[in-house]
Design a protein with these regions (language model features):
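C-terminal and inter-domain tail/linker signature
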Residues: 1-141
Length: 141
């Protein structure tokens, strides 16, 4: 049975404390991450090293990134979290020069756990709002 505390720990250790050791501990070898792309190519994240490449780019772009878990749910071996992401885009990463813009957007992560490690993840974050807040995407249609 999965545990909602896992999600709080994932976001606190991996994102708020920026711990790569936590990535190695909490993400299984061969874990598949849907909804995110490996910066080195590929339409998904596969394994800890692939995730670390993306994590490093995000942390470089948003050194003060903070993710707050708003809600969690558990369904068998799956745990989900609705989150709020805040930060300041001060780093040159993710394909754009720093804008010094603040972002505040939400998203959801659902993970499947095996032996207290993520083996599969589904990411649904509102990156359109993030890009709009940075002024690089207009949502006026």
């Amino acid at each position: 049975m999965a545990n909602a505390d896992f999600m709080h720990r994932w976001f606190e250790e991996v994102w708020n404390k920026k711990s790569e050791a936590a990535i190695d501990e909490m993400l299984a070898p061969g874990a598949i991450g849907h909804g995110l792309q490996d910066p080195d190519g590929g339409d998904k994240i596969i394994g800890p090293e692939s995730f670390k490449r993306l994590h490093r780019q995000f942390v470089a772009a948003y050194p003060d990134i903070h993710i707050e878990v708003l809600d969690t749910f558990v369904d068998g071996d799956k745990v989900g979290a609705r989150c709020r992401v805040t930060g300041t885009h001060t780093g040159d990463a993710l394909g754009m020069a720093p804008t010094n813009g603040r972002v505040d957007f939400t998203g959801m992560l659902v993970v499947r756990l095996d032996n207290e490690r993520i083996v599969e993840a589904w990411n649904q974050f509102d990156f359109m709002t993030m890009y709009s807040q940075l002024g690089v995407l207009s949502l006026n249609v």
